[in-house]
């Protein structure tokens, strides 16, 4: 096969021309003298149509029959080179169709396990390496790719430098009970749960930094929003106020949504995502509400007919039902700010005049998707941070490098982190986070 190949996504530029595409057979149908072949190549799905009389006219009676029979006998996921004339077709969701003139089999496929019928989740997860080939899973991966692309673009445009934090560490950024431990040449080491502590060093050197990579949390959680291995974007910046940080986070999330609308509109269409809702999240300002005001709101509405959450007092942490109600109440992504210090990380800076609250924020996504961003201002005073660590009984020797940052020219600084899979799930409108990463790692799943 020596013809130049094009991608399915580019066929719009070749209307009326004969092209060759390398693809897999997603499905086929037809009867008699016509065959419909659903093709995919990773960029899009596309329908090819083969007419038996056309093959006989072009190749003769015997060869025409043989070539058409090859198409009729194609199995799902057979790989092919398919040649044909690109035609516009208003009936097609893609807008185009291929009038097949030739087809060459590259690799046979027999008894492909994921047939067009319905399959259970466990079966699909056991065959995740194949499930990724399906239309909806491909769409989710395209949305993930668009979000990653938009992340790098946004931080580059806003003066941030990519700063790679280590995966292996001897200390915890947050809850030490959620760490995966491994042996490091006879010493205990832990897989990173956040690059934040190292990013703070980066911010003191470079001003504005971000990292993007896998993190690990040994949470024994079975919810639809938790993975034990996921990809995290952490950003850290010097000389930025709490309000400026919230502005930056809002601009970032809006840039991610816009990036998907621009780069993966067909994926949103495949997933039947409410695009108008996504556009509204871009155009309308995000809401900001204090933790204490949010608790008061929850208390005022807990007797409402449509509420389904437990009573909370000031000082209690939100559960998923509370987060869902808050974001749905406001109808747009909502920042809840200034949580109690009692259940937040040791490094968060207290609210001036109110040491029981810290300068932090969680961004809650509407439609039941919950927290997608967590961020805070960091305690920049050495003595105050040491006192907090002593109060919590922490071993300061494990954080000597972190404390050094407060001894040599400390400045106001803060940061935030976003789990990419949660953002993908929200933008894609899918129900479970396991579909937002190629090979999910969960409490009872470590293969394939």
From Swiss-Prot:
Protein name: Asparagine--tRNA ligase
Protein species of origin: Streptococcus pyogenes serotype M4 (strain MGAS10750)
Family: Belongs to the class-II aminoacyl-tRNA synthetase family.
UniProt cross-references to CDD domains, sorted A to Z: AsnRS_cyto_like_N, AsxRS_core
Molecular function terms from GO: asparagine-tRNA ligase activity; ATP binding; catalytic activity, acting on a protein; nucleic acid binding; transferase activity
GO biological process, one term: asparaginyl-tRNA aminoacylation
Gene Ontology CC annotations of this record: cytoplasm
Keywords associated with the record: Aminoacyl-tRNA synthetase, ATP-binding, Cytoplasm, Ligase, Nucleotide-binding, Protein biosynthesis
Gene: asnS
Localisation per UniProt entry: Cytoplasm
EC number per UniProt: 6.1.1.22
SUPFAM superfamilies (UniProt xref): Class II aaRS and biotin synthetases, Nucleic acid-binding proteins
Pfam families (UniProt xref): tRNA-synt_2, tRNA_anti-codon
Enzyme class (EC, first level): ligase
Keyword check for Magnesium: no
Matching Gene3D superfamilies: Bira Bifunctional Protein, Domain 2, Nucleic acid-binding proteins
